[in-house]
Each structure stands twice: as structure tokens, then as C-alpha cells.
Amino acid sequence: MELATAGKVNEVLFMNRGEGESSYAQNSSFTQQVASMAQPALENAVETLFSRDFHLQALNAADLGCAAGPNTFAVISTIKRMMEKKCRELNCQTLELQVYLNDLFGNDFNTLFKGLSSEVIGNKCEEVPCYVMGVPGSFHGRLFPRNSLHLVHSSYSVHWLTQAPKGLTSREGLALNKGKIYISKTSPPVVREAYLSQFHEDFTMFLNARSQEVVPNGCMVLILRGRQCSDPSDMQSCFTWELLAMAIAELVSQGLIDEDKLDTFNIPSYFASLEEVKDIVERDGSFTIDHIEGFDLDSVEMQENDKWVRGEKFTKVVRAFTEPIISNQFGPEIMDKLYDKFTHIVVSDLEAKLPKTTSIILVLSKIDG
């Protein structure tokens, strides 16, 4: 199935479910690492909300693209802890926290809500009672009533696209990104342009929807996968997709995958530069940029001394967030072979010395009026 429409992507874009060894819940250590780096930005956003004269009785916060790992629990705990701190400082009496957890319909909401222990949300007798609700649906459209949210958080979700970029086949119906699943050094310029155009369209839709839902002077804290350099085909920003394409091509050569399935598949994700993100926000004009920064991190797997252990652990992380969409295109029956091949490529081609991963932290405030 070619991922040419938003409806198709929405059906298959989710992290691996459950709590098994290939699940996202068990393989989200890197995004936890990213979230810990972004925690000060979230803390500052809550502080900022208290400095703006909202006369709050309840703070309404949304975590968009929450998945089902422990990262969402850390977000809730951080917001709640900062609210309790400010309440003690300001002698607030009846402040409550309402958190909306959003992701697409295929998300493992059962595992997510099973993890919402009293340690995360506390109890209703505490100084800041916390109430949690699930909100399934695409964040590229409206999810909440007008002027209903004070704080929006999203981590490692906004770089996913509503569909594979348009215009990646010729008039004759030939694939323009043959043998690849993302931008690469061999991709023609039209592929790069199509990916940036799709990200521009989708991120603008995201901002437009939030501009209607967030109250004036409300805050958004967005963490997304990105890149430091201007070249989107730089190995640091596309190595995961490049290695996956190599693994798929190996199975094509063995007759296990039809070549046309590889040629017509383009991953619906884009790792933008800081300049591209900034430009889209400024063009939209609904939010001011309070803070934007990029930072590079080694994956936690790099702490392992043995290259095979590093490679296998990295494969589990990649499988956790790619298997549903990859399986939908190429078939569940060859997933074990595919990710085993991926491990061998990681170890032999890179000696499991993985490039650093770039993340972008973006803090926005809704313009008043």
C-alpha cells in the first residue's frame, strides 16, 4: 500500500504496542533522554503561565502524540510538580490540572492508561488534583474547543507527516526515489523539495489548529527530530532510513520483497532544520518564538562496549517506532528477517558507531489578539 493519503497513514502510524521486547514501552530510552534534556523548557513554560494573569482555577494541558511509553508520565509529573511549587509560592487554594493525552487511533491507549499509577497523577486530595483523559485523533486538525488549552506539549511527533510527500512519481508513473525510502545523496532535487513542501503544509496545519485551541498567551513546548546542517541528505539526519532501505533492498535481491514495493514507498517523516522550523512559525504568524535550540545526543546504546550488543539494542529501538508502518507496506511475515538484516548492516557498515541524533526544542507563545 502506497502511503499517498493522510487517511492511510493515520491507520498505520503508531508505535509497537504492548510491553514485549519489541514494544515502544520497552524501547523508548532515547526519547526519555531527549525529554530529560527538554524538561527545563517545560518547567519554564509552566512558570511563564503563572506569570501571565490567567486567574487559573484549572490548568488545561495536552500532550500530543503521546504514544504509550513512560515519557508521557514524566511530562504529567513535571507539570504537576511545577504547579505545586507555584501554588505554594503564591498561596493558591483550588488549582487543578486537566491533562489530555492524544495520539492516533492505532495508539496503544490500554498500555498507556495501565501505566497511569497514583505515583504519576497522585490523588484527588493533593494540593493540585490531576485529571487525565484520552483524546484519539490527528493533531494536524482540531482536537479541542476554541481557547481551551493553556499548555501544549509534544515530543518526537511533529516531524511525522500526514502522508508520503506528493509528486514522487513521474508523469509516466515511474518512481522518482527508486530504491530509497527517504531523502538520500542519490535522490533527485524534486524529492527534497517534495519532503520540505509536505512538512511545510503539515506543520502549518498543526499551528493553525493549535492557534484556535490555545488561549492568548498560552504556551507550546515542542520537541522534534531535526538536523543541524542545511543538507537534508546528510548522513547524520537520515542514517536510520538509509540503513533500513539497504536492508529492504537486500530482501528484494533475495526475492522476498517485490521491488516495486520498495520503489513506491517513502517514509512519511521529515527532519527539518532549525531555519526551516523558524521560517514556518514566522510565516504562520499565530505564535511568537520564545526559545529555539538544537542539540545532539548519542543514543544510550553507544554506552555498550560490544558492537553486536550496540547493534541489536539499536535495532530494537528502531523496530519499536518503524515496524507498524514498515510491516503494512512489506508484510508482517518478513519483519524478523528484515530487522535481523538491519542489525548486520548497522554492525558491518557502521561498526555500530552511530551518528549523533539532532533534536529541536521549540517554545512558542500564542499571540494575544
UniProtKB/Swiss-Prot annotation:
Biological classification of the source: Eukaryota, Viridiplantae, Streptophyta, Embryophyta, Tracheophyta
Site residues (Involved in substrate discrimination), renumbered to this chain: H153, R225, S269, V317, P332
SUPFAM superfamilies membership: S-adenosyl-L-methionine-dependent methyltransferases
Positions that bind caffeine: T31, Y156, H159, W160, R225, F321
Pathway membership: Alkaloid biosynthesis
Any one GO MF annotation of this record: metal ion binding
Cofactor: Mg(2+)
GO terms classed as biological process: alkaloid metabolic process; methylation
Family label: Belongs to the methyltransferase superfamily. Type-7 methyltransferase family.
Note describing how the cofactor binds: Binds 1 Mg(2+) ion per subunit.
Function: Involved in the biosynthesis of caffeine. Catalyzes the conversion of 7-methylxanthine (7mX) to theobromine and of theobromine to caffeine. Has 3-N- and 1-N-methylation activity.
Catalytic activity: 7-methylxanthine + S-adenosyl-L-methionine = theobromine + S-adenosyl-L-homocysteine + H(+); theobromine + S-adenosyl-L-methionine = caffeine + S-adenosyl-L-homocysteine + H(+); 1,7-dimethylxanthine + S-adenosyl-L-methionine = caffeine + S-adenosyl-L-homocysteine + H(+)
Organism from which the protein derives: Camellia sinensis (Tea plant)
Biotechnology: Saccharomyces cerevisiae (Yeast) expressing Coffea arabica (coffee) xanthosine methyltransferase (CaXMT1) and Camellia sinensis (tea) caffeine synthase (TCS1) accumulates caffeine.
Top-level division of the source organism's lineage: Eukaryota
Binding site for S-adenosyl-L-homocysteine: Y24, C66, N71, D103, L104, S138, F139
Identification of the protein by name: 3,7-dimethylxanthine N-methyltransferase TCS1
Tissues and organs where the protein is expressed, per its UniProt entry: Expressed in young leaves and flowers.
Keywords on record: Alkaloid metabolism, Magnesium, Metal-binding, Methyltransferase, S-adenosyl-L-methionine, Transferase
Main EC class the enzyme belongs to: transferase
